[in-house]
Amino acid sequence: TTVCLAIPLYEKLVYLKKYPVAIIGGILAGMFACLGGVLVLSMAFGLDHTQYVTLLPKSITTAIGMGLSEELGGMVSVTVASIIVTGLFGNVAAAAIFKLFRIKHPVAIGVSCGTGAHAMGTSRAREFGEIEEAMSGLSIAVCGLLTVVGASIFAMIQF
């Protein structure tokens, strides 16, 4: 899988060099939207701390999300289910969301697919094009690493 994601990225390295601020900014915005959304909804629905930290890794790839959930004291099986549901929703809704918001730039499409819907989003990004696929693959890795740090900080929030 890593090689399959790395080859398109290497071939489209020019886009990474051309749009580094947009790519990192998009990944950070997506990560904070996910973590902030989980925080707000957890407070609104009265979830306890265990349920809250269980949902924090919902927008990263399963391999990273399982370890993060366990480290934060979450319920790993529920985390896996939330990751799958998030990925499925992102995969199914991606085209409609891009059309609704008139998002046409291949880098923006790729970053949002990888950041918001991880591997399932990347499979959808591949249907849009090679640039989208490469940016989505990059976003999976970077978002996963940043979310480990971000979720650890968000997990300290008590409500």
Describe the residue ranges of each PLM region:
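Hydrophobic transmembrane alpha-helical segments of multi-pass transport and channel proteins
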Residues: 88-93, 144-149, 153
